[in-house]
Curated annotation (Swiss-Prot):
Keywords on record: Activator, DNA-binding, Nodulation, Repressor, Transcription, Transcription regulation
Gene Ontology molecular function: DNA binding; DNA-binding transcription factor activity
Organism: Rhizobium tropici
Entry protein name: Nodulation protein D 1
Family assignment from sequence similarity: Belongs to the LysR transcriptional regulatory family.
Functional description taken from the UniProt entry: NodD regulates the expression of the nodABCFE genes which encode other nodulation proteins. NodD is also a negative regulator of its own expression. Binds flavonoids as inducers.
Amino acid sequence: MRFKGLDLNLLVALDALMTERNLTAAARSINLSQPAMSAAVGRLRVYFEDELFTMNGRELVLTPRAKGLVSAVREALLHIQLSIISWEPFDPFQSDRRFRIILSDFLTLVFMEKVVKRRAREAPGVSFEFLPLADDYDELLRRGEVDFIILPDVFMPTGHPRAKLFEERLVCVGCGRNQELSQPLTFDRYMSMGHVAAKFGNSRRPSIEEWYLLEHGFKRRIEVVVQGFSMILPVLSNTNRIATVPLRLAQHFAEVLPLRIMDLPLPLPPFTEAVQWPALQNSDPASLWMRGILLQEASRLALPSAEH
């Protein structure tokens, strides 16, 4: 099929080449022979009047013209796939769909475990790929490279549909033997104690508690920075440091670690964990099914009370 002189099949080849950055891998990903893929490269170069790729060993290096085409080609193919080609009926029990989800380790531990267990009963062939919080999740959503992101709603990009999952609140945690926590925590002591904080992604994006504190004009004395929530609580062991974490995460670790959980001595509001998906997948039957599972499991969560 041609559109204004361009064989649309070549866009599939171009997308594979720009994704894989390797001729052999790109050919394999779309079930073409290597000679056929080489021929496609030649035709693409003629059409776009640009080399598009140069070789660096076995790696294909994109020219500036090719870099400018990456998003446009991916979005065009995604739109054709999701909006023009008819949806196939989705049978969870028969499906082998893999869902790619960006979320924090906190959510993996306290929420997705329940979703995974339910999947085993209702959709044994369905699988998940949980991805760490990235710096470019907005772009990944736009290109349809992930199925969902699950984040505090204050961090979510615009332009894609979303739904509320559950509310969470922040608490202070420390080692159970931390004598500084043997009495109610005052604001002055909270601010003066050494803190452990989490950052995410290559740009060291702050976690929700850091964002809230900065929004309210509070700056803690951070002694240790770790990648992800799950590394915070083990680092508190046998120290006088404290951390500010989601309550459900604190209670999850309190089952196996000697932790003390305390209310924060400052007025930070609860926050909302939400799920967001690509706009072009809004009517995808598989995405609709998965959204239903997420919302149903979230509705079963009650906001627990902090233990003192």
